[in-house]
Amino acid sequence: MLSLQILAIVALVVAAIIAIVVWSIVFIEYRKILRQRKIDRLIDRIREREEDSGNESEGDQEELAALERGHLAPWDVDDL
């Protein structure tokens, strides 16, 4: 009976060690996934800003080109 108790204690210790190792691996992988999500969000934000800045500058230039501008000089120009 004593050997059965020793075997049970050894089995519990081995099971506890295996559980600790498995949960450690799970925790490490979870941190990797979180880090990758942060990187993906940053990349998405950079792409959005890149698209926004590119579109705004082209759009502004097109809008400015479409505007009818008068004389650029602030003084009275009489060139008729």
From Swiss-Prot:
Residue ranges, Extracellular side: 1-7
Modification after translation is described as: Phosphorylated by host CK2. This phosphorylation is necessary for interaction with human BTRC and degradation of CD4.
How is the activity of this protein regulated?
Ion channel activity is inhibited by hexamethylene amiloride in vitro.
Xref: InterPro entries: Vpu, Vpu_cyt_dom_sf
Which spans of this chain does the record mark as coiled coil? none
Where does it live in the cell?
Host membrane
Membrane-protein topology: Single-pass type I membrane protein
Q: Which domain of life is it from?
A: Viruses
Annotated region (Disordered), positions in chain:
49-80
Q: Where is the composition biased (Acidic residues)?
A: 53-65
| Keyword set, alphabetical order | AIDS, Apoptosis, Host membrane, Host-virus interaction, Inhibition of host innate immune response by virus, Inhibition of host tetherin by virus, Ion channel, Ion transport, Membrane, Phosphoprotein, Transmembrane, Transmembrane helix, Transport, Viral immunoevasion
**Keyword Membrane included in the entry's annotation:** yes
Q: Name one GO biological process term.
A: symbiont-mediated-mediated suppression of host tetherin activity
Task: Give the record's GO CC terms.
Answer: host cell membrane; membrane
Cytoplasmic topological domain residue ranges? 29-80
Could you list the residue ranges that cross the membrane?
8-28
The Phosphoserine modification is found at S53, S57
Q: Which GO terms describe its molecular function?
A: CD4 receptor binding; monoatomic cation channel activity
What is recorded about the protein's domains? The N-terminus and transmembrane domains are required for self-oligomerization and proper virion budding, whereas the cytoplasmic domain is required for CD4 degradation. The cytoplasmic domain is composed of 2 amphipathic alpha helix that form a U-shape.
Q: How does it assemble?
A: Homopentamer. Interacts with host CD4 and BRTC; these interactions induce proteasomal degradation of CD4. Interacts with host BST2; this interaction leads to the degradation of host BST2. Interacts with host FBXW11. Interacts with host AP1M1; this interaction plays a role in the mistrafficking and subsequent degradation of host BST2. Interacts with host RANBP2; this interaction allows Vpu to down-regulate host BLM sumoylation.
Which protein family is named in the record?
Answer: Belongs to the HIV-1 VPU protein family.
What is the role of this chain?
Answer: Enhances virion budding by targeting host CD4 and Tetherin/BST2 to proteasome degradation. Degradation of CD4 prevents any unwanted premature interactions between viral Env and its host receptor CD4 in the endoplasmic reticulum. Degradation of antiretroviral protein Tetherin/BST2 is important for virion budding, as BST2 tethers new viral particles to the host cell membrane. Mechanistically, Vpu bridges either CD4 or BST2 to BTRC, a substrate recognition subunit of the Skp1/Cullin/F-box protein E3 ubiquitin ligase, induces their ubiquitination and subsequent proteasomal degradation.
- More details: HIV-1 lineages are divided in three main groups, M (for Major), O (for Outlier), and N (for New, or Non-M, Non-O). The vast majority of strains found worldwide belong to the group M. Group O seems to be endemic to and largely confined to Cameroon and neighboring countries in West Central Africa, where these viruses represent a small minority of HIV-1 strains. The group N is represented by a limited number of isolates from Cameroonian persons. The group M is further subdivided in 9 clades or subtypes (A to D, F to H, J and K).
Specify the protein name: Protein Vpu
Which organism was this protein described from? Answer: Human immunodeficiency virus type 1 group M subtype B (strain 89.6) (HIV-1)
The taxonomic lineage of its organism, from the top, reads: Viruses, Riboviria, Pararnavirae, Artverviricota, Revtraviricetes
Gene name for this UniProt entry: vpu
